[in-house]
Curated annotation (Swiss-Prot):
The gene is pwp2. Residues 900-911 have a biased composition (Acidic residues). One of its GO terms (biological process) is rRNA processing. This is Periodic tryptophan protein 2 homolog. Residues 893-922 are annotated as: Disordered. One of its GO terms (cellular component) is nucleolus. It comes from Dictyostelium discoideum (Social amoeba). Part of the small subunit (SSU) processome, first precursor of the small eukaryotic ribosomal subunit. During the assembly of the SSU processome in the nucleolus, many ribosome biogenesis factors, an RNA chaperone and ribosomal proteins associate with the nascent pre-rRNA and work in concert to generate RNA folding, modifications, rearrangements and cleavage as well as targeted degradation of pre-ribosomal RNA by the RNA exosome. The keyword Ribosomal protein does not apply.
Length: 922
């Protein structure tokens, strides 16, 4: 089994606190999720969490105009400079407090960062790592804390809004500053109203104040017109008092003109229970978006302050808002509900509507095909998440109490998920019709703590917290078939044997019992332990059974003889950090040093275990050793992350994290926690400041074995062997043009030239590079091809197939792309379904055309072959006959010659004989 699991995605949490951003193209939203960042692609409907963690919860975000540099700052002022394209940290910077505002200039050359009363100007870093990423240019100090800033369109002016109602406009390198004072109220945000920067807006909790910049010539002209009309030339102070707002401009005569107060307009729904929470302004479309604490937002058209749209989108206050580059999409974040919305106000439709669990997530389960994940939380909701897109596409709210367990039916064709809750019900949900089609209840009202489904999906069992019994139901009939009694403490875990008809139950009474619920309904085996049993699990083949105990041990049993074959002591591996309320060191604290959740890998060789700490451990069963250890979080905003506490934060009256704060600047800028004041009649007097502790509440392994998920305090973490983190491997600092592409091609950098051509998106260039890649280099290019451009490349292949007929060359590409990236193509088939269908259609059509010609050619070749064979055969026979005849002729000739020779020889002998006879006679 491979152990190269890496963090892949974070589900279950879409927004915590801080501001949200649109990317420059307007199609992507960046949302802070704890100490991580989640990017939502609104066009492809996918979300991915960047593999970057800050030290504390992120509170401020800023993105450069070109979308390459992202700056984040957390609660402690720790600032990260991130290359968003490559998803790497370029550098770090430490401020003494969390910045209230971080803003890039429109030309992208300068960064303005406001920290308390100071405004720092830095030079924008390059997209490469360097020792000092932020070079400070200048710093300005003010009398009050800076709340907001705004750059002019030409990047020469910087507007600064302070907490005491002071508004300043700094111009370029000069020391000239324009001052405005809004008495009686603070400033929430400030903006320039036009591209010429001659209109200034300041948003207060009650309304909107505006100023116009008038040149000396314009003021003289207006003065003459007013004198001719019998009007005064200047606005009197009494007129401002009527608006209950006094605005004081500088008395000095400015260069070429001065700022003139135009008026103050109140928000129509302002009241005691309705406070302004967030404001943003879109310069191109002149839209002002105001979000209120009631969950309502109003869209105004400026400069006329005309109300265009009004809608209530949430039951809680809107924490942050943003407008995309076209002004059509409005993004909202609600920290109390963990909700993220994107609304298209012209068509009145949701582009994105995601919400995590309001409270902690208790349980998680993978579907049989590994495509979806079911989660249950303390808020009584069951959510179904798509592992590919990272979106929640259905939420079931039928439970009236916290959900303690969720399980999928092992039969994938049933499309059923079961859930158990403390409300005393077991509910079955249909994932096709999205409804609760069956509810199982016990005779006596009880709280269910665990759930198990048999391999056939026909029987479910649930364990009780208060009655210590196990209830068994038939899914088909919905009737209670049996009640199993025998435990003396709450039942904490149930597990069905995948092969044999047995049910295992674990309880706090230090026992683990094996039930035969299908035959005699009696206890087949009872395993006693020396400490409380926390959880148990079967392997996929049913041959091994593991039990986790309170003493930190994991005991391994063989199911054939139920003999113990191994013991893993993991209390030192699961040891977490020290909490701010702990009086002893973490290594001396025995509390929580046990595995509360364990799961087998699909091959049954390893187990994945977690507990009340930030660590996840993977053990090998046979060797009983720790193979790998994962840390689920490094967020110091959570408790129990470090091995020891920070003694600088411990005072005479305890730890600073446990003390109440009269003013929380991150939650509400202008509202103190008055419920803690002496004589206050409202508020919960039992409230305390607490920190969440990082722990693992559930573990589930994908049936494919390539991923596993854990539900933690921060959300649902997915660790995978597949690299789904998209990044652009092309160095964006290089000028991508046809000449640079051809030069890379001449240098035989085939992969880089192909990616650059796809990025340039000019078909002739892509075709030239594509056809220039040698046949023997295709495999290497396909193997290293980034999935970031896979969709565009498949689209190119589908179009290239229709026009060109380099069949073997094209099929080589298709084959190798499918081999090396088939997993990703399968899981993301919906996003590229059009290109895949076009490619399939073209290949099928080519196959049909070629196959018909090939079949005809094959038949013709068979005919010619047959004729040729016959001809050859007849020719061979003829040759054989001719050879025989020739041999016979030769034989006859040789015989004739022989006879002639014999005749001649006989004549000669006769002559000799006669001569001899004559001689003898003589």
């Amino acid at each position: 089994m491979k152990f190269g699991y890496k963090f892949s995605n974070l589900l279950g949490t879409v927004y915590n606190k801080g501001n949200i951003l649109f990317t420059p193209d307007g199609n992507t939203v960046i949302s802070p999720v704890g100490n991580r960042l989640t990017v939502f692609d609104l066009v492809n409907h996918t979300s991915i969490t960047l593999p970057i963690q800050s030290k504390y919860n992120i509170r401020r975000l800023a993105l450069s105009p070109n979308g390459q540099i992202l700056i984040t700052s957390d609660e402690s002022g720790h600032t990260l400079i991130i290359n968003l394209t490559r998803q790497v940290v370029l550098g770090e910077y430490k401020f003494f407090k969390t910045p209230k505002s971080i803003l890039f200039s429109p030309n992208g050359a300068i960064i303005a960062i406001a920290v308390l009363e100071k405004v720092f100007l830095f030079k924008t870093p390059i997209i490469q790592k360097q020792p000092n990423p932020l070079i400070r240019l200048s710093v300005f100090t003010h009398k009050s804390a800076v709340i907001s800033m705004c750059w002019s369109a030409d990047s020469l002016k910087l507007m600064i809004g302070c907490k005491n109602g002071t508004l300043l406009i700094r111009q370029g390198k000069s020391e000239r500053v324009s001052y405005f004072q809004v008495k009686g109220s603070g400033i929430i945000n400030c903006f320039f109203g036009n591209e010429e920067s001659t209109i200034a807006y300041a948003v207060t909790p009650t309304g909107l104040a505006s100023w116009d910049y008038k040149t000396n010539e314009e003021m003289e002209q207006e003065k003459l017109e007013r004198v001719e009309n019998g009007e005064t030339a200047y606005l009197r102070e009494e007129e401002m008092d009527e608006e209950k707002l006094k605005v004081i401009t500088e008395n000095q005569r400015l260069y070429k003109g001065r700022w003139i107060f135009k008026g103050f307009k109140k928000f129509e729904n302002y009241g005691v229970k309705c406070k302004v929470k967030t404001v943003c302004f879109h310069l191109k479309s002149k839209l002002l978006l105001v979000g209120f604490s009631t969950g309502q937002f109003i869209l105004y058209e400026m400069p006329g302050f005309n109300q265009l749209y009004k809608l209530n989108i949430s039951s809680h206050g809107i924490s942050t808002s943003a407008i995309n580059n076209t002004g059509e999409w409005l993004a909202f974040g609600c920290s109390e509900l963990g909700q993220l919305l994107v609304w298209e106000w012209r068509s009145e439709t949701y582009i994105l509507k995601q919400q995590g669990h309001s409270y902690n997530m208790n349980t998680v389960a993978y579907s049989p095909d590994g495509q979806t994940i079911a989660t249950g939380g303390e808020d009584g909701k069951v959510k179904i998440w798509n592992t590919t897109s990272g979106y929640c596409y259905i939420t079931f709210t039928e439970h009236e109490g916290p959900v303690t367990a969720v399980k999928y039916s092992p039969v994938s064709s049933q499309n059923v998920v079961f859930s158990a809750g403390v409300d005393g019900t077991i509910r079955a949900f249909d994932l096709v019709r999205y409804r609760n089609f069956r509810t199982f209840v016990s005779p006596n009202k009880t709280q269910f703590s665990c759930l198990a489904v048999d391999p056939s999906g026909e029987i479910i069992a649930a364990g009780s917290l208060d009655s210590f019994e196990i209830y068994v139901w038939s899914v088909r009939t919905g009737r209670l078939t049996d009640i199993l009694s025998g435990h003396q403490s709450p039942v904490c875990e149930l597990a069905f044997d995948p092969i044999n008809p047995f049910l295992a139950s674990a309880s706090w009474d230090k026992s683990c019992k094996i039930w035969n619920i299908f035959e005699d309904r009696e206890i087949r085996e009872s395993i006693q332990h020396t400490s409380d049993v926390l959880t148990c699990a079967y392997s996929q083949d049913g041959k091994k059974f593991i039990v986790s105990c309170l003493d930190g041990t994991i005991q391994i049993y063989e199911t054939s003889t139920w003999g113990q074959i191994g013991l893993i002591d993991g209390k030192n591996d699961i040891m977490g950090g020290r909490g701010y309320k702990d009086e002893i060191l973490a290594k001396n604290n025995s509390a929580g040093r046990a595995f509360t959740k364990i799961a087998f890998t699909p091959n049954g060789e390893c187990i994945i275990a977690g507990g009340n700490s930030k660590y996840i451990c993977i053990y090998h069963i046979d060797q009983q050793v720790l193979i790998k250890k994962y840390s689920t979080s490094s967020n110091l905003s959570l408790d129990g992350i470090t091995l020891d506490i920070n003694w600088k934060r411990v005072g005479e009256f305890g730890h600073l994290d446990a003390m109440e704060k009269d003013f929380d600047s991150d939650d509400d800028l202008y509202q103190q926690n008055k419920e803690y004041l002496t004589g206050s009649s409202k508020g919960d007097l039992s409230k305390r400041t607490t920190k969440k502790k990082q722990k693992t509440t559930s573990i589930s392994v994908s049936p494919t074995g390539r991923a596993w998920a854990v539900s933690t305090t921060e959300g649902l973490l997915i660790y995978s062997l597949d690299d789904f983190l998209f990044f652009d491997p092309t160095d964006l600092s290089i000028d991508i043009n046809p000449d640079s592409i051809l030069s890379e091609l001449n240098l035989k950098n085939y992969l880089k030239s192909l990616i650059m051509s796809i990025k340039l998106n000019e078909k002739p260039i892509i075709e030239k590079v594509f056809e220039s890649i040698p046949f023997n280099e295709i495999q290497l290019v396909c193997q290293e091809f980034p999935i970031y451009y896979l969709k565009n490349f498949i689209q190119f292949l589908s179009g290239y197939f229709e026009k060109n007929h380099h069949l073997e060359f094209q099929m080589k590409w298709v084959k190798l792309i499918s081999i090396y990236h088939g997993k990703y193509i399968k899981t993301n088939s919906l996003s590229m379904i059009t290109s895949l269908r076009n490619l399939q259609k073209t290949i099928t059509q080519t196959y049909n055309d070629i196959s018909k010609v090939c079949d005809d050619n094959i038949f013709s070749m068979e005919y010619f072959k047959t004729v040729l064979l016959k001809e050859l055969k007849s020719q061979e026979e003829t040759n054989k006959i001719s050879k025989k005849s020739q041999k016979y002729k030769k034989y006859l000739e040789s015989k004739k010659n022989k006879e002639q020779e014999e005749d001649q020889f006989s004549d000669d002998e006769e002559t000799v004989y006669q001569n001899n006879k004559k001689n003898k006679n003589k």
